[in-house]
């Protein structure tokens, strides 16, 4: 039986990110995922500049950027259309070297993370 340094259960965005970070640092990684393919609809839709730094470390930003949108803000409305929270986001690069807010399609991210693991 082969031994692994790390076992990760689930290959969603968190599991895929962790697997890439461990592999990048020389750990052998066993990934357990019950689904044959990723779920085709989005669930997570937002991340910030700190997460983009992690993706930069992994090495997926060049390919993944074309699937992201710089988020200018979010308005939350109630059932009558009244704005209950307006959350504008600055559109300038932060000290982390990235914009403070991005929108994305989760299946695109999962595809990029899995592609990187195959290399």
Residue ranges and their predicted role:
Residues 43, 48-118:
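Active-site-adjacent segment of FAD-dependent monooxygenases/related oxidoreductases
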Residues 10, 26, 59:
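Conserved functional loop/turn residues at catalytic and ligand-binding sites
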Residues 23-43:
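Glycine-rich FAD pyrophosphate-binding loop
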Residues 16-17, 49:
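Short alpha-helical segment within the catalytic ATP-binding CA
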Residues 2-3, 39-43, 47:
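Accessory recognition modules or surfaces
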Residues 1-14, 30:
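Beta1/beta-strand and adjacent pyrophosphate-binding region of the FAD-binding site
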């Amino acid at each position: 039986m082969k031994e692994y340094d790390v076992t990760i259960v689930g290959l969603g965005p968190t599991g895929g990110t962790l697997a890439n970070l461990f592999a990048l640092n020389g750990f052998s990684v066993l990934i357990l995922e019950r689904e044959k393919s990723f779920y085709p609809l989005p669930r997570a839709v937002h991340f910030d500049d700190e997460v983009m730094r992690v993706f930069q470390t992994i090495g997926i930003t060049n390919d993944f950027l074309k699937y992201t949108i710089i988020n200018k803000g979010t308005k939350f409305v109630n059932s009558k259309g009244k704005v209950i929270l307006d959350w504008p986001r600055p559109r300038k690069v932060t000290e982390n070297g990235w914009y403070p807010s991005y929108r994305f399609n989760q299946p695109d991210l999962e595809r990029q993370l899995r592609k990187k693991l195959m290399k």
